């Protein structure tokens, strides 16, 4: 029984509510034991390396010299958004007011369970050492960003050895900014780094890392007719199973769906989640594919607006590659959101856009897109430009794995020869028009992404947003 839970706290405004009382200390033996489910959490759970690495070495090919490195990263592990937290708290309230003794998969709730959202001020925010439920939690966004910085130095440190001053770019989302700052902290005090905070408001127009926010034509509910075809009866199965174990509980399919988010965000905040153990492996697979479907048709190749939106950043990336010999800065690091990265990868063509995902069943052999592989919390997409003898090449590294361009990968380390790459890039953006497709002029006069080139004179420092 969970008599300590107080509905007035849970139902209070998520902005103004106070701290939820603490329960017992987390069981440290469980922390770090659930990594096998990370790929099934739709990108809401902790960072993990891209599983489909094809066995290609991440190292720079022999006798080659790196010329430029670009990185577009997602913010690190975080607490749920306000809207998602409302759903989680609604389900938590139902559990906390259950008057019986919990049995079966929910029996852990009998033992003074401590709800992981202890303070609603943490909603939307990065998980840190300070706000984590357990100080031993290895999955905080803070620690992830600092580990990423150390990995960056190990892989590319020589690129910044003689470049002690350079810029790092972030959207003005608080959690993206925090990730960028923790990354900078992880680099140490050797560098003089200028953190440029770029607006993600629609008024930013094209001069943003978050182009979909500047797109009035963007439809959050696009392709719902396709998504509704997906069989979600497994959710009612979860609810029925738990209700059968606990008479009078009355969980619904909505509660069952909420448990997946609860599982992911609790791991981010605590280091493990007993809620995750209520699912069968089949249920995790079905949920994961549902997330793949939603992403593919609403922020990926299945939505025709996306390719134009992603072209805003991809065009800037290609321009930087072409200017690598004249630019003093050789490393370009940016932090933003998962949607922006998915748009970017869609335009690049890394995500297959030739075979639409089916909503009729869970495909296995035909499914090449897995949302969480590309955008777990703390995701990172590197663009490498390197020279071997007299030839220059480009390749992509996604979450620690080299992911070749399918039609252009005959160079060293399965890279793409530079002129072939530029030709490929032209084809990828042919027919795209971010400004026109999105009707950007209705919200902004900004028609070009310029912050990579004018940061030293404009000094971007937009007000941080709690989102």
Swiss-Prot record:
InterPro entries: Acid_Pase_AS, His_Pase_clade-2, His_PPase_superfam, Histidine_acid_Pase_euk
Posttranslational mods: Glycosylated during secretion across the membrane.
Active-site annotation: 75, 338
Highest taxon above the source species: Eukaryota
GO terms for MF: acid phosphatase activity
Gene3D superfamilies from the UniProt entry: Phosphoglycerate mutase-like
PROSITE patterns in UniProt: HIS_ACID_PHOSPHAT_1 (PS00616), HIS_ACID_PHOSPHAT_2 (PS00778)
Keywords on record: Glycoprotein, Hydrolase, Signal
Catalyses which reaction(s): a phosphate monoester + H2O = an alcohol + phosphate
Segment forming the signal sequence: 1-17
An example Gene Ontology CC term for this record: fungal-type cell wall
The enzyme's E.C. designation: 3.1.3.2
Up-regulation conditions: S.cerevisiae has 2 types of acid phosphatase: one is constitutive and the other is repressible by inorganic phosphate.
Glycosylated sites: 97, 162, 192, 250, 315, 356, 390, 439, 445, 461
Comment field (misc): Present with 3290 molecules/cell in log phase SD medium.
Similarity comment: family membership: Belongs to the histidine acid phosphatase family.
UniProt-recorded name of the protein: Acid phosphatase PHO12
Native source organism of the sequence: Saccharomyces cerevisiae (strain ATCC 204508 / S288c)
Lineage of origin: Eukaryota, Fungi, Dikarya, Ascomycota, Saccharomycotina
């Amino acid at each position: 029984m969970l008599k300590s839970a107080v509905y007035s706290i849970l139902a209070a405004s998520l902005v103004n509510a106070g701290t939820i009382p603490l329960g017992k200390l987390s069981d440290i033996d469980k922390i770090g034991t659930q990594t096998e489910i990370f790929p099934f959490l739709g990108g809401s759970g902790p960072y993990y390396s891209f599983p489909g690495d094809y066995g290609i070495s991440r190292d720079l090919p022999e006798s080659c010299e790196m010329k430029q490195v670009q990185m577009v990263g997602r913010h690190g592990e975080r607490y749920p958004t306000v809207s998602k937290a409302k759903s989680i708290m609604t389900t938590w309230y139902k559990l906390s007011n259950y008057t019986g003794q919990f049995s079966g998969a929910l029996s852990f709730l009998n033992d003074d369970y401590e709800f992981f959202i202890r303070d609603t001020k943490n909603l939307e925010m990065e998980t840190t050492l300070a706000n984590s439920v357990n100080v031993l939690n290895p999955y905080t966004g803070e620690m992830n960003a600092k580990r990423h910085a150390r990995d960056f130095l190990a892989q590319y440190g020589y690129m910044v050895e003689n470049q002690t001053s350079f810029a790092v770019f972030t959207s003005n989302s608080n959690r993206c900014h925090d990730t960028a700052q923790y990354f900078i902290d992880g680099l140490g005090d050797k560098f003089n780094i200028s953190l440029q905070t770029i607006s993600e408001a629609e008024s930013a127009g094209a001069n943003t890392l978050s182009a979909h926010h500047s797109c009035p034509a963007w439809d959050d509910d696009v392709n719902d007719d396709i998504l509704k075809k997906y069989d979600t009866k497994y959710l009612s199965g979860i609810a029925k199973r738990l209700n059968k174990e606990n008479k009078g509980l009355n969980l619904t399919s909505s509660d069952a769906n909420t448990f997946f988010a609860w599982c992911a965000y609790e791991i981010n905040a605590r280091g493990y989640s007993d809620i995750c153990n209520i699912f069968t492996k089949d249920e995790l697979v079905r949920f994961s594919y549902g997330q793949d479907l939603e992403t593919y048709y609403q922020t990926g190749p299945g939505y025709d607006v996306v390719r134009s939106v992603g072209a805003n950043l991809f065009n800037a990336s290609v321009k930087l590659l072409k200017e690598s010999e004249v630019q003093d800065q050789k490393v370009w690091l940016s932090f933003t959101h998962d949607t922006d990265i998915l748009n970017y990868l869609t335009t690049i063509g890394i995500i297959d856009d030739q075979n639409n995902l089916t909503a009729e069943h869970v495909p296995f052999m035909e499914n090449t897109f897995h949302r969480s592989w590309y955008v777990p919390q703390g995701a990172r997409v590197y663009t490498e430009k390197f020279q071997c003898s007299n030839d220059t090449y480009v390749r992509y590294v996604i979450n620690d794995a080299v992911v070749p361009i399918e039609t252009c990968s005959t160079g060293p380390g399965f890279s793409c020869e530079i002129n072939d790459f530029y030709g490929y890039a032209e084809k990828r953006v042919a027919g795209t028009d971010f400004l026109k497709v999105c009707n950007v002029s209705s919200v902004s006069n900004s028609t070009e992404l310029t912050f990579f080139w004018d940061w030293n004179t404009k000094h971007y420092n937009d007000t941080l947003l709690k989102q």
